[in-house]
Amino acid sequence: MKPEEKARIIIDRMLNDAGWEVVDRNHYSPEVSAIAVEEGLLKGNREADYLLFLNGKAVGVLEAKKESVSIYSEIVADQAEKYTRGVPHWCQAWMNPLPLVYLSNGRELLFRDTREVDSEYISLNKIHSPKEIVKLLGLKDDFAGLPTLKRKGLRDCQYEAITKLENSFRSGHDRALMVL
């Protein structure tokens, strides 16, 4: 296994533990409440290692490096911050440029909120949960901090019914009838 792959496995686990569903870009679904898209496409044919979405809107990027690469490098930070300004047109964003930047090599994790121009990267023990990001950014969305519904243990019809119910409420409907 390559060093990059080892770091990705650790980072995937960190994201999952925080409540993010990690998927490759071919399996992105805007219906998932908290999703980290691997190799997220950006403007100019660039790819963010992870593009973070809350309720179908991009909120930040996570730049992953192999364990031997220092994430304290200005080059790594500049690369990730460029990605925050490259949100493609097909993708909605909570803010543009994206406000949150994470850097990780699987061992260490740095974070910066780019809304504060002179802010510095700070070291974190874990990635923010979707609920913590909702509070941090002051997002006004009742569903943005909800955990992602997991398919495991549900029949396809149950998963589909619950997902459609959530989408109905997200769309502003205040009532729904669900029959299983």
Residue spans of the language-model regions?
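ATP-dependent helicase/translocase motor core
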Residues: 1-180
